[in-house]
Amino acid sequence: MTRSDTAMSDAATHELVLTRVFDAPRELVFQCWTDPEHLAQWWGPAGMTPTGVDVDTTDGGAWRIGMSDGEAEYWASGVYLELAPPERLVFSFKWDPREGQPDEDTLVTITFADRDGKTEMTFHQTGFATVESRDGHTDGWRSTFDELAAHLDSGEETS
């Protein structure tokens, strides 16, 4: 895997933009975001293990994904607002209430572009309550995308 990612953020608007190139076709990268069997293999940053995946991949369908660090579980959920395979995915994102976890609803927009057989994925998340929350998510998503890249590189197929 070639790690090629860039990050931009805007303190005034509390937005996060990450761009990463994956050595995989965009159809597969998109599927990794919407297929529960794929999600169960890569979702979460290093040191976390997916513990549950429930997705209804229709416009307006709900999703909920859990992960654990071995001591505690963390759950996030939202609603799919737009699914345009393999080009664009839009969903709401919110952490379940937990002490120390920000209570904020964010919006995630992901675009997938073909780049000579590879996929350029642009991840855009808006609606952070604080710059600190945005910055924490930046580190988490970067590590999560490393997990996605490792999953893609493994060549593991789902049933």
Please tell me what each predicted stretch does:
Residues G70, P85, R115-K118:
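Short strand-connecting beta-turns/loops that link adjacent beta-strands
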Residues V29, L39, W63, Y80, ...:
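Hydrophobic pocket/interface hotspot
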Residues V90-R142:
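Beta-strand/loop substructures that line and gate deep hydrophobic ligand-binding cavities in soluble
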Residues T13-T19, R26, P50, A62, ...:
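Intrinsic-disorder/low-complexity, polar/charged segments enriched in Ser/Thr/Lys/Arg/Asp/Glu/Gln
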Residues V17-L18, E37-E73:
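Short beta-edge strand/loop motif at the mouth of beta-sheet-based domains
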Residues M1-T49:
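Hydrophobic ligand-binding cavity/cleft-lining segments
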